[in-house]
Amino acid sequence: MKIFREVFELGNKEIILETGGMARQADGSVTVSCGNNVVLVTTVVKKSVADGTDFFPLSVHYLEKTYAAGKIPGGFLRREGRPSEEQILISRLIDRSIRPSFPDGFFNEIQIVATVLSYDGAFSPDILALIGASASLAISGAPYDDVVAGVRVGYTNGKYILNPNKQDLRDSDLDLVVSGTDDAILMVESEANSLPESVMLGGILYAHKHLKTIINSINRLAKVASKPRIEYSIYQINKFLKSQIKSQFFGEIKNAYTIASKQERNLKLNAIRKNVLEYIFSSDVDGNEYTEKEILEAFHDIEKDLVRSNILEGKPRIDGRCTETIRPINVKIGVLPGVHGSALFTRGETQALVVTTLGSDRDAQLVESLDGIEKCRYMLHYNFPPYSVGECGMVGMAPKRREIGHANLAKRATQAVFPNEEAYPYVVRVVSEILESNGSSSMATVCGSSLSMMDAGVPIAEPVAGIAMGLIKDGAKYAVLSDILGDEDHLGDMDFKVAGTRYGVTALQMDIKIKGISREILEQALEQARVGRLHILGIMNEVIKEHKEAVSDVAPQIHVMNINPAKIKDVVGRGGATVKGIVEKTGAQIDTSDSGEVKVFAKDKKSMDMAVAMIEEIVAEVEEGQVYKGKIVKLLDSGVFVNLLGSQDGYLPFSEIEQAGMKTNSLVEGQGLEVLVQNIDRGGRVKLSLVAR
């Protein structure tokens, strides 16, 4: 067993790459270690293309084992179940980073599995998994020449932090992950606290310059441990077939791409495709040698060339816009009468119905991870039904990876403006239903979420808007597109999503289909996105620019009380009897804390007020010189104990009773008396006198 090892430093932390010791049946196997974190990453490459495959079947699976943190899984089976949303998001992050590095037309299946074997809690293992995925690919024999690396960057007190730990990130205004090759940026994922575009760009460039160290280490490992390059073929469009279709149908295709409506354009293009198939199969140009798949791929290549060349030549885009124009926007709030908050955001042919629901602490999501169980007060879910693109399909299934990814992006975009628990005790769930989609539905979700929460009375710090930018690049010529359509996303080279407030960026996500982009393009895209974002915010602000002061009449009510911690036991009562009685009488939910915090959550104001009044009566403090109506709770030889407020009793001597002209032999337990608090001693004992009738 021969072990190969590479060691490098990243942010003053030593990282070790090692191969040859584990999982030797895989084509590529690398363990990545940093401190007590260990991630095993394997790559398996199929040596032939499966029949009928017309895409690159790359799959990435990031898995966390609970034993890595010295824990036993919960649940009846006591074993790991399906991957959590966080694990799915990390899988997507790795996939998006490495996918652009493979040659176009490479259709061999590749599966990458990253398994967290040991975890110390200080650093997230995601960057180690990304580095390991690249290293295992580099030694697997796959056609992976442009080695990719990734780093995380934070930003605190005006300084960038390389490879920040979890504590650093809690204090950071930025959580930025950048991946790329030695000379190009391929993927960006970030969450920020309304930072200027210049800081975001600086963070991306700062991250990129530190990739070289990692890439050099991977290359050194590959030089000594790589398997022979597999034999593979690259699928290519048949140029002769493409020329035949273009010579006969280019005019019709060109006219179809002047139709602004997506549905009408697709109807026209489908009719042309049908005619193309009939022509090729019935003509004398060796049409019968071609499959339907080959013909349609050649047709698609003509479409791609047409759309891209039009934009690069300065001609109008598919829907007639110039590169910087935003589609028409329509904003409505309060569109659903029975919900707590709602908004309908429409941008061109993309439409999101976003609904906000308010709940109590008991509605918070409990998220289990290697760090333990965390309470999540803000949830955002994204649904993409098939009818949104005019198709039939599966409905009501578990969310797909894309839906999870879009929801996470929208949540990260709005997280920076979401109020903390002290300022806003509600738990909030936001759901985005995509009713129509023609590009940038995740950014429509960002806008709709901001509007919906303001409609529900959630005190977000600032409205947030999002915009998707695109890129068409051919050699030195390029065009940056604002507010891209679905076809422009599909046929273009970049999907660059930017969300933020009027003050700066809160989230940024970039995916590249080509071999990276330059600083100049990044700067232009960020500036163009800033202008577009402010335009969208202006339209949103015309409808609502700050949260409503009161929640909806149909929304639940919540009230937070801070009482003397010693009084919590009085509110709860023996065996919980007192609090249960309040709940039964009012229908409210009551949560208490040893710190003295009491949360009252009720379906309406009447129930809440009743519960609050009952609690206030229990915890009220008696004061000297005040008169109270009490009840006798205990008879003694020398006097009686009278209950005043809640569990507070006072002592009333017989002498005081007789002095007031009342006979002591007529007193019984439960009898009402009006008494005056004469004094309260240092021990809290209360002495009473009887108020004369």
UniProtKB/Swiss-Prot annotation:
Swiss-Prot/TrEMBL cofactor(s): Mg(2+)
Gene Ontology terms: cellular component: cytosol
Keywords: Cytoplasm, Magnesium, Metal-binding, Nucleotidyltransferase, RNA-binding, Transferase
Coiled-coil regions listed: none
Family the entry assigns: Belongs to the polyribonucleotide nucleotidyltransferase family.
Subunit field text: Component of the RNA degradosome, which is a multiprotein complex involved in RNA processing and mRNA degradation.
Name of this protein: Polyribonucleotide nucleotidyltransferase
Organism: Francisella tularensis subsp. novicida (strain U112)
Gene (name only): pnp
